[in-house]
Design a protein with these regions (language model features):
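A conserved mid-protein helix/loop that constitutes part of the nucleotide-sugar donor-binding site
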Residues: 19, 204-227, 241-247
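Donor nucleotide-sugar binding/catalytic pocket of nucleotide-sugar-dependent glycosyltransferases
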Residues: 53-55, 132-135, 139-189, 200
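Short alpha-helical donor nucleotide-sugar binding micro-motif in glycosyltransferases
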Residues: 146, 264-265, 272-277
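Short hydrophobic beta-strand element within catalytic cores of glycosyltransferases
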Residues: 302-305
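Aromatic "clamp/platform" in nucleotide-sugar-dependent glycosyltransferases that forms part
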Residues: 285
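N-terminal subdomain of nucleotide-sugar transferases
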Residues: 1-56, 366
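Nucleotide-activated donor-binding/catalytic signature segment of Leloir-type glycosyltransferases, i.e.
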Residues: 245-265
Length: 379
């Protein structure tokens, strides 16, 4: 098949959407399909060969993101690619462009719901109005947007449940998680060099991976260090708009010896960082899947996660990890349970991750594409 992936965010931005696009495009190409990535233009210095770009400008509230200029004269470019299906990632400007091209060409579109937009309003919205009102307006927009593609894809069942609760009525839905490379993220990797690099000897290491942003609730993870034994360290991997504020919080809480920040870590080292650790943690209630949790599980790590949204579909309490509520004390308790049960949980965590292999999810996606294309042709 010839597949156009239109995404609201792409490299050099690093987030779950970008990872999802990169992973999906690789899995589809490995299966013998042709994939075209279409993204906002980050400027000449950051362009990648083989990616089609729409003119864009930086988003002032979050300068790591780029907003495509609307309208633009690039629609004919997409039409010239002669694709069988358009796969939209996001609900903003690139997504709207995808719908316009789909309608003008008759090429069916599907959309992956990647981001819980309402949860970001408090932190990044440029609109001068109460967050509650913005949230209601966002759901009005999403109810209108999400009924237009031929199918809406959620990474977990929790996403589709949230649609139902907020009156979203897509034409069709499917649950297909973002895949992971289970050959790259695996048991038995040697993380000793990473431990040495960051000054760890016999300490237990709890890792948090992802954008350091306000909606990720990282403050709970940081404060949990106060309730952990002296030989436990929290390692926060990644950067983002809350990076400096979270570093300041560590200092304010007097936790400089127990919480370390690595900043951005290259993709080719990430699996080693997981393997250098003992537990993966996330206090976020924002995730549509929690991709880094699955990656860590593939490396045998038990997961200490908040008991909300998509984590409920990935983590089984007491089997491959432990849940906690919203307090630092409860987070610390879940971490200690993970540490105490690490050897028992490691193979179970790996077994969970294997269900999310790139190959398996890529095949599911192709089957969905073929079904959607067939339905459109016969309708």
């Amino acid at each position: 098949m010839r597949i156009a992936i239109m995404t609201d965010s792409y490299l050099p931005t690093r987030d779950g959407v970008v990872t999802a696009v990169m992973t999906l495009s690789k899995s589809l190409r490995d299966l013998g399909h042709t994939v075209f990535i279409i993204a906002p233009d980050p400027g000449e210095a950051h362009r990648e060969s083989g990616v089609y770009y729409f003119p864009a400008m930086k988003f002032k509230k979050y300068p790591e993101y780029y907003l495509p200029i609307f309208p633009s004269g690039k629609r004919k470019l997409i039409e010239s690619l002669n694709v069988d299906i358009i796969h939209i990632h996001g609900i903003a400007f690139m997504a709207l462009k995808g719908l316009i091209v789909s309608r003008s060409t008759g090429v069916p579109s599907v959309a992956t719901y990647c981001t819980n937009v309402v949860d970001t309003m408090e932190f990044y919205s440029p609109l001068p109005m109460p967050t509650e009102i913005q949230g209601r307006l966002a759901w009005i927009y999403m109810r209108n947007f999400l009924k237009r593609p031929s199918c809406i894809i959620g990474s977990t069942p929790a996403t589709l449940t949230e649609f139902e609760e907020n009156g979203v009525r897509p034409k069709r839905t499917a649950v297909i998680p973002v895949g992971i490379d289970i050959q790259r993220f695996r048991l038995g990797l040697d993380g000793s060099e990473i431990r040495k690099r960051h000054g760890f000897t016999d300490e237990k290491v709890v890792i948090h991976v992802g954008r350091v942003s306000y909606e990720k609730n990282i403050g709970v993870t940081i404060k949990s260090a106060k309730y952990l034994p002296d030989d436990v360290r929290i390692m926060i991997v990644g950067k983002g708009p809350a990076f400096q504020d979270m570093k300041d919080l560590v200092k304010e809480e007097g936790l400089e010896d127990k919480v370390i920040y690595t900043g951005f870590v290259p993709d080719d080292e990430l699996a080693l960082y997981y393997s250098a650790s003992d537990v993966v943690v996330s206090a976020s209630r924002f995730e549509t899947q929690g991709l880094t949790i699955t990656e860590a599980m593939a490396c045998g790590l038990p997961a200490a996660c908040s008991d909300g949204r998509s984590f409920l579909d990935v983590v089984e309490d007491g089997v491959n990890g432990f849940f906690f509520k919203d307090t630092p004390e409860e987070c610390a308790e879940a971490i200690m349970k993970c540490l105490a049960n690490k050897d028992r949980i490691a193979p179970l965590a790996r077994k969970t991750a294997e269900e999310y292999s790139m190959e398996a999810t890529g095949k599911k996606m192709i089957a969905l594409y073929e079904s959607v294309v067939s339905d459109v042709k016969t309708s």
